[in-house]
UniProtKB/Swiss-Prot annotation:
Residues 1-22 form the signal peptide. This is Non-specific lipid-transfer protein. It comes from Gossypium hirsutum (Upland cotton). It comes from the Eukaryota. One of its GO terms (biological process) is lipid transport.
Length: 116
């Protein structure tokens, strides 16, 4: 379960997946992003798994409001505190590799209140 949480932490920061207002549950986010875990814990030498990009695109499409994105960010940052081994350099490149554009930096230090 901790590997799934690692993926959720990074990628929800990436796409601002909606967890508030009943739009998407934490379980749905975790399942959508689980295919990204091995990539984010590796060297980045291989291609991003197709299932990872599918999850990122799906969550990005579901993120409709600023409050929902901010709530997701806070949830993910909280979970990230106990997870090791994620390459945040790889995480920051995932949106572009999956054809998703986001207007903020992917980082554990991201200010969730500034996510739009």
């Amino acid at each position: 379960m901790s590997l799934k949480l690692a993926c959720v932490v990074v990628l929800c920061m990436v796409v601002g997946a909606p967890l508030a207002q009943g739009a998407v549950t934490s379980g749905q986010v975790t399942n959508s992003l689980a295919p990204c875990i091995n990539y984010l814990r590796g060297s980045g030498a291989g291609a991003v798994p197709p299932g990872c990009c599918t999850g990122i695109k799906s969550l990005n499409s579901a993120a409709q409001t600023t409050p929902v994105r901010q709530a997701a960010c806070r949830c993910i940052k909280s979970a990230a505190a106990g997870i090791t081994g994620i390459n945040f350099g790889l995480a920051s490149g995932l949106p572009g590799k999956c054809g998703v554009n986001i207007p903020y930096k992917i980082s554990p230090s991201t200010d969730c209140n500034s996510v739009k």
